[in-house]
A protein has these predicted regions:
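Membrane-helix boundary connector in multi-pass membrane proteins
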Residues: 93-99, 115-129
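Membrane-interface loop-to-helix entry segments
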Residues: 40-54, 96-109
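N-terminal membrane topogenic signal
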Residues: 1-12
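Helix-adjacent hinge/juxtasegments
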Residues: 54-90
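Alpha-helical transmembrane segments of multi-pass membrane proteins
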Residues: 14-28
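Membrane-interface helix caps and helix-loop-helix hairpins in membrane proteins
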Residues: 91-101, 149-154
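Membrane-interface helix termini and inter-helical loops of multi-pass transporters
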Residues: 26-39, 151-154
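Final/C-terminal transmembrane alpha-helix of multipass membrane proteins
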Residues: 131-149
Length: 154
């Protein structure tokens, strides 16, 4: 029962971070900027991010199950930090329309996700595999962010 409740809390926390970030999503500004031909359709972002946040939550939960909060303070701190960075990216990109700062921030976010993955690996190897789609998506999002910045500069 305790583990099930903890899993629900990890998922709720992750989806809470997603909800904060989604407050700044798309809208007229994004619809009006120049996009590359390979830009994904808007409808894909919601389901894709939800799945990735859920996988990250399960990974963090697995780490907690193996080491507890005391034994996994560092890895779980990294987990919380990268969730916060993800929300900041949404605010910079969609809320402030600062593609330049968002690009720099997404590089930091990617590094934070990678550090989280490595920290999880020391405690629970399968937990380090679950964030791989998230890491790949953020790499893609970084390339897209950089391309959008270049196409819309000036």
């Amino acid at each position: 029962m305790r583990q099930s409740l903890a899993l629900c809390l990890f998922i709720a926390g992750s989806l809470g971070a997603a909800a904060i970030g989604s407050r700044f999503m798309t809208g007229e500004w994004y619809a009006g900027i120049v996009k590359p031909s390979w830009n994904p359709p808007n409808w894909i972002f919601g389901p894709a991010w939800t799945l990735r946040y859920a996988l990250m939550a399960v990974a963090a939960w697995r780490v907690w199950c193996r080491a507890g909060f005391g034994g996994a303070r560092g890895p779980l701190g990294l987990f919380a930090g990268q969730l916060a960075l993800n929300a900041v990216w949404s605010w910079l990109f969609f809320g402030r329309h600062r593609m330049d700062l968002a690009f720099i921030e997404i590089l930091v976010l990617w590094a934070a996700i990678f550090a989280t993955l490595l920290a999880f690996r020391r405690i629970d190897r399968p937990a380090s595999w679950l964030p791989l789609p998230y890491l790949a998506w953020v790499a893609f999002a970084g390339v897209l962010n950089g391309t959008l910045w270049r196409l819309n500069a000036g």
